[in-house]
Swiss-Prot record:
It catalyses: 5-[(5-phospho-1-deoxy-D-ribulos-1-ylimino)methylamino]-1-(5-phospho-beta-D-ribosyl)imidazole-4-carboxamide + L-glutamine = D-erythro-1-(imidazol-4-yl)glycerol 3-phosphate + 5-amino-1-(5-phospho-beta-D-ribosyl)imidazole-4-carboxamide + L-glutamate + H(+). It comes from Vibrio vulnificus (strain YJ016). InterPro entries: Aldolase_TIM, His_biosynth, HisF, IGPS_HisA/HisF, RibuloseP-bd_barrel. Heterodimer of HisH and HisF. GO terms for cellular component: cytoplasm. Its main location: cytoplasm. Pathway: Amino-acid biosynthesis; L-histidine biosynthesis; L-histidine from 5-phospho-alpha-D-ribose 1-diphosphate: step 5/9. This is Putative imidazole glycerol phosphate synthase subunit hisF3.
Amino acid sequence: MRVYRMLRSRVIPVLLMREKGLVKTVKFKEGKYVGDPLNAVKIFNEQEADELTLLDIDASRLGHEPDYVLIERIASECRMPLCYGGGIKTVEQAERILKLGVEKVSLSSAVFENPKIITQLAERVGRQSIVVCLDVKKRLFGSKFDCFTINGTKKQSVDTIEFVKQIQTLGAGEIVLNFIDNDGVMKGYDLDAVSKFKALVKVPLTVVGGAGCVDDIAKLVQQEKLVGAAAGSLFVFKGKYKAVLINYPSPSEKKKALEL
């Protein structure tokens, strides 16, 4: 397996899309409307975000194809690298999305149904364009994590540790760990769990779930030396009453957070 040298750390907003609008969930439930995706992209452009992840959380659940027209509009507006996930089941769908100007595709449900899609896609477009996103939840008893799909509603019958190893062997260029229990809680990342997973990962690793302030990002990056620190609520809410306000750390805040 190829071992990656340390890349520059990135602070990544994660936007959840439902019915062409943006929502923010808590522990993968509910879904508060937080705005229009094109408007959000324009704001993140102005604030010079490192990268942007857009996930259509209804596409796989409802069996929809990706909304190629909207994806193309968003990609054409985006002045930062864009990763898209949601409803991707085939190599052809993934290739079509990449041709729209998207830099990376994020696979989730598809890798459990057909793990070989990772290898097939890597051979066609290169592993650098392939992200595997694992939605993980800690078991009630013990320290093990299970993988879920379909917005956290379908538990997958895989050994999570072994699956993390397998997807790297198959050609995943990046792994995103999305901690379900931390989603929208804004009380910090699960650093102990991140540390255990990081020991298994030889490709770039991004973590999402739990960030409530820039200091949380700093702790994650500085302790675990991760390539990606991602967040949702942190970048769409502001203040103790969580007013909807698209935001991103200032250059000085980000520089301080990413000091290694």
